[in-house]
Amino acid sequence: MAKLIAFNQEAREGILKGVDALANAVKVTLGPRGRNVVLQKAFGSPTVTNDGVTIAREIDLSDPFENLGAQLVKSVAVKTNDIAGDGTTTATLLAQAVVTEGLRNVAAGANPIELNRGIAAGSEFVVGKLRERATDVSSAADIANVATVSSRDPEVGDMVAAAMEKVGKDGVVTVEESQSIESYLDVTEGVSFDKGFLSPYFITDTDTQHAVLEQPAILLVRNKISSLPDFLPVLEKALEASKPILIIAEDVEGEPLQTLVVNSIRKTLRAVAVKAPYFGERRKAFMDDLAVVTGATVIDPEVGVNLNEAGAEVFGTARRVTVTKDETIIVDGAGTAEAVENRRAQIRREIENTDSAWDREKAEERLAKLSGGVAVIKVGAATETEVSERKLRVEDAINAARAAAQEGVIAGGGSALVQISKELREFAQEFEGDAKIGVIALANALAKPTYWIADNAGLDGAVVVSKVSELPNGEGFNAATLEYGNLIEQGIIDPVKVTHSAVVNATSVARMVLTTEASVVEKPAAPAPEAGHHHHHHH
C-alpha cells in the first residue's frame, strides 16, 4: 500500500478539515433542542440517533488526511465513552475548538511545544475546578435527574434511579429488549465479575459491542485450556445440544482459542471464552461460587474431573450471559436456591472464623456478589430502530448515573465550563508567550458546548455564553425553557466524571495534533481502468 506524506501546513489543514467534519455532524445533537442524525449503514436499516459516540463511530472520510483528523477526534469520543459512558459530544466539541485555535496559532508561527504546555496546565486547572464545584449525589431524585438529562426521558430517569436503589451504586444494571412495547424494570439474581471476552470476535451485538448468550452451556475449568484434543469432545457436547457455550478458565490459548474464534466467525457455534478473575485461592473460591450459581461442575484434575472425559453433565447454565470487553454478567443461573443459600451460609461462617482482615474483606465481597441482584431494564418500543435507539439512551443514562454517584455533579448545559473558563483566563496571566496562548485557547474552547446548546435552541450563542459566565456556580442557561436559573435545582446536571474525562481526552488529542509535523497515511488505491467487460469489485 503506498503511503502519502504531507508536512506541516498541508498535513494540519487536512487534519483540521476532518476534525471539523466529524465535530459538525455531532454538534447539532447537543442540548435538549438538539436534532437527531440519521446514519445510513452499509447494511441493515438506517439508525436515527442523538448519541455522539454512535455518530462518531460511523464517520469515515475519503480523503486520507481528513480521515486522520476525524479518527483522532473519534478516539476522543470513544475514550470518553469508555471511561464515563457519556459526554462524547462535549468532548468532541472541546477537541475541535482547541485544535482549531491551536492550529491557527501554529500557522502564525507559535511554538507547538509551548502551546501544549499551556493546554496541559490549563487542563489540570480545569479538572481541579470541576472537582471543587462538585455537588454530591445521594438521593434517588438526584440520580433520576442525571439519568433524565442523559436520556432526555423522565421515564428512563426514574427506572435507572429505581434500579440503582435496588442494587446499590456499585451494583449491576443491564439493558435488554423487552418482548412488548412496554419498558419496565426487573431485578433478578445475577453475578458479575471484571473480566471480559478473550477475543472481540466473540461479540454478537455490534451496536453495543457485547457478546450475549441466551441459555448457554457454561463450562468452568480450573486450569488453562491449551490442548485441542482434550477440549474438542466437550465442545462437541455443546454443539450436539445446540447451545451457545461460555467458557471460564484460568486461560484459553493456542488452538482451542483459535477453534472458538473460527467457529464464532463462521457462526457454526456461539462461544465466548473468559479468563477467570483473581488469583490463587481467591480464584479457586470464586470459581466454586460460580459452579453453585450456575449448577456446573468445575473441571479439575486434582479432584479427578478431567477435561477430556467430561460430558454434558459438567455444564451449568443461566438465562443469559452478557460479556463486554471488561465484564461478565451471568443472570439467573440455574443453580438451586437451596445450594446458593448453603454456599452463602458457608461464606458467612468463613467471615466469622477468620482473623485476617484481608480474607474477611474478600469473603464479604464474595458474599455480596452471591447475594447481589442484577437490575435489568427491559426496553420496549414499537419498531426495531426505535428499540435500538432507546437501548443506547438507557445505557448512556445508566453510565451517567453511575458516574454522578462516584464523583458528584455540576450544573449542566456546559455552564460550569463557561464559568471555569473565566477563572482559567485569570490563571493564564501566570504564563507568557505561546504557553499563555495555549491556556487561552482552552479557555475559549470551554465556552463552546454552551454556545452550541444555545445555537441549537435558536438563540445567539455568544450572548448566552457571556450571560452564563456572569452567573454564580450552579446557575446557567436552561435550553428547554430558554431561561436562566439554578440548574442544579432544576435537575439539569452533568456528572463531574463525564465532564472531566471530556476535558482530559479532548486536550490530550489536541496536543497530539498540534505537535504533528508530518502525517503519513495510506494512499487510496486508484480505481482500476475498466476493460471491455465489467469487473465485479469485492470490497
Curated annotation (Swiss-Prot):
A single cellular component GO annotation: cytoplasm
Chain sites annotated for binding ATP: 29-32, 86-90, 413, 478-480, 494
Keyword ATP-binding among record annotations: yes
Location, primary (coarse class): cytoplasm
Top enzyme category: isomerase
Reactions the enzyme catalyzes: ATP + H2O + a folded polypeptide = ADP + phosphate + an unfolded polypeptide
Cell compartment(s), UniProt: Cytoplasm
Any one biological process term the GO annotation gives: protein refolding
Entry's Gene Ontology molecular function annotations: ATP binding; ATP-dependent protein folding chaperone; isomerase activity; unfolded protein binding
InterPro entries the UniProt entry points to: Chaperonin_Cpn60_CS, Cpn60/GroEL, Cpn60/GroEL/TCP-1, GroEL-like_apical_dom_sf, GROEL-like_equatorial_sf, TCP-1-like_intermed_sf
Keywords: ATP-binding, Chaperone, Cytoplasm, Isomerase, Nucleotide-binding
EC number: 5.6.1.7
Keyword Glycosyltransferase on entry: no
Listed CDD domains: GroEL
Subunit and interaction comment: Forms a cylinder of 14 subunits composed of two heptameric rings stacked back-to-back. Interacts with the co-chaperonin GroES.
Protein family: Belongs to the chaperonin (HSP60) family.
Function summary: Together with its co-chaperonin GroES, plays an essential role in assisting protein folding. The GroEL-GroES system forms a nano-cage that allows encapsulation of the non-native substrate proteins and provides a physical environment optimized to promote and accelerate protein folding.
Protein name (database record): Chaperonin GroEL 1
Organism whose genome encodes this protein: Corynebacterium diphtheriae (strain ATCC 700971 / NCTC 13129 / Biotype gravis)
Gene responsible for this protein: groEL1
